Amino acid sequence: LALFLTGVAQQHAQLLQGERPLHLRLSSYVLCLARAPDRELLKLCARFWQQWATFLSRSFPRAGGGAAPEGEYSLLTQQVIELLTQRMPRPEEVMMMENEDGEVVRVESRDTDGIALYKSMRESFVLLAALDYEITEAILMHALDLQVVFLSLSPL
């Protein structure tokens, strides 16, 4: 379903962007699919969100005194920012290991799939954050608050 919806969105982007209710409904479906705990689904949806964020940043330019997305686009933008905040993978793993000489060295493990997903989601996040930085700040502060509460409740 995600492959079909994102494929239709990519092939008919101009038509969908002209039909706001249809574009919002399709975007809502992709948002629901992106919440599934499947990494392949997330990759498909991340490409869609990258195109969607580009469309919104062109439609609602902030730097030129334009307005942030309002109404349903604003709600969907907020939900996508929350999803990106929750599901964005770490860029790469860095571990400290002892080599054969007994020295502690830094070892980076490469996850090319994860790096590509991270870059795609990061670009979407940056574009959406530029559109409505107040909502983005509130979402990030809430996520940090949850981490602090979790750390304070976990035993040392």
Task: Annotate each language-model stretch with its function.
Residues 1-32, 121:
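Non-catalytic protein-protein interaction scaffold segments in large eukaryotic complex-forming proteins
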Residues 28, 35-156:
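Alpha-helical repeat/alpha-solenoid scaffolds of the HEAT/ARM/MIF4G superfamily
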